[in-house]
């Protein structure tokens, strides 16, 4: 007897196989949602409430995905499935393009999926990411205004609102990663990082050359970030606490600074938060001139 099944076989032989019932016992159990499922469930609810649709694509892509570091297969069955994707964004762009050809102009979607990349040890890594695409639709806020496209800052605000709902502190910095050079706008792209400096993902506007090539709106925005990092960060966050509502009115102060053009608003915001008191609750950029 070397395995568990060997022991079960001996018990069955001694007890008698003909004495076993042919029906399964009724066992009522309550399933447990792991942290990964809970994270996806929460993100999905936030994005669905924001008007997004969940999309699903294959992990295998062709060689023309606007990204050069896709992992090629040695013996693919189809030319359209000849590589493992290194990003979710090409498939999202392709879906929007195909929908526009069919007259469906309102496609704002997100996708959970695995991406593949090589590391310094000449091995391959598989990570779970979430990516999304939105914008490109001209709307108006009221009857007296003309149709307007979603601006970069309004699109950024949507992502910031998502992070706020997830109770995540995310920092934005200038984009230097060359992986997305053919997909994202060179001057309207930002890298997202967590408090400890770990790179979370990327957000940006579609590259104008790619938009013209595919006959897409230039006001189209894409994001992609690591789902495992989001899960770990949410897990490490402190639970939300409730406190008594203040009986005093809030105080709003307007501050003006003269700074070098190389200094970003994020740096100023960090200094204000670090030196502010416990009563400081919110910092917003009002104007730049």
Where are these regions (language model features)?
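A residue-level signal for conserved active-site and pocket-lining positions in enzyme catalytic cores
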Residues: 8, 47, 92, 132, ...
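Conserved alpha/beta core surface patches that mediate binding of polyanionic ligands
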Residues: 54-55, 86-134, 208, 219-238, ...
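Short, hydrophobic beta-strand segments
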Residues: 1, 22-35, 70-77, 126-146, ...
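Short helix/loop capping segments that flank catalytic or ligand/cofactor-binding pockets
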Residues: 2-3, 55-58, 64, 81-83, ...
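Short glycine/threonine-rich loop-to-helix capping motif typified by GTGT followed
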Residues: 1-6, 32-40, 66-70, 121-126, ...
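A carboxyl-terminal module marker
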Residues: 139-289
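Extended, well-folded interaction surfaces typified by the phenylalanyl-tRNA synthetase beta subunit core
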Residues: 1-110
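Short beta-strand elements
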Residues: 6-12, 75, 114, 123-136, ...
């Amino acid at each position: 007897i070397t395995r568990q099944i060997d022991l079960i076989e001996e018990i069955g032989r001694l007890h008698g196989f003909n004495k076993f019932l042919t029906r399964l016992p009724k066992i009522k159990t309550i399933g447990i949602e792991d942290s990964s499922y809970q994270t996806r469930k929460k993100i999905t609810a936030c994005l669905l409430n924001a008007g997004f649709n969940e999309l699903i694509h294959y992990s295998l892509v062709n060689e023309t995905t606007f990204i050069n570091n896709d992992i090629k297969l040695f013996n693919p069955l189809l030319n359209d499935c000849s590589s493992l994707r290194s990003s979710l964004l090409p498939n999202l762009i392709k879906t929007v393009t195909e929908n526009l050809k069919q007259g469906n102009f309102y496609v704002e979607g997100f996708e959970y999926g695995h991406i593949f990349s090589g590391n310094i040890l000449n091995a391959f890594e598989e990570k779970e990411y979430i990516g999304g695409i939105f914008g490109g639709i001209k709307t108006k806020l009221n009857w007296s205004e003309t149709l307007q496209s979603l601006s970069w800052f309004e699109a950024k605000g949507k992502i910031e609102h998502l992070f706020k709902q997830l109770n995540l502190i995310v920092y934005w910095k200038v984009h230097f990663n060359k992986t997305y050079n053919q997909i994202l706008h060179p001057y309207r792209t930002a890298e997202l990082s967590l408090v400890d400096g770990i790179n979370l993902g990327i957000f940006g506007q579609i590259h104008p050359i790619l938009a013209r090539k595919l006959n897409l709106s230039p006001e189209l925005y894409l994001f992609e970030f690591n789902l495992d990092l989001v899960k770990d960060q949410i897990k490490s966050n402190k639970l939300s606490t409730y406190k008594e509502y203040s009986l005093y009115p809030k105080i709003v102060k307007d501050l003006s600074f003269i700074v070098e053009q190389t200094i970003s608003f994020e740096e100023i915001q960090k200094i204000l938060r670090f030196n502010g008191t416990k009563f400081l609750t919110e910092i917003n950029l009002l104007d730049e001139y």
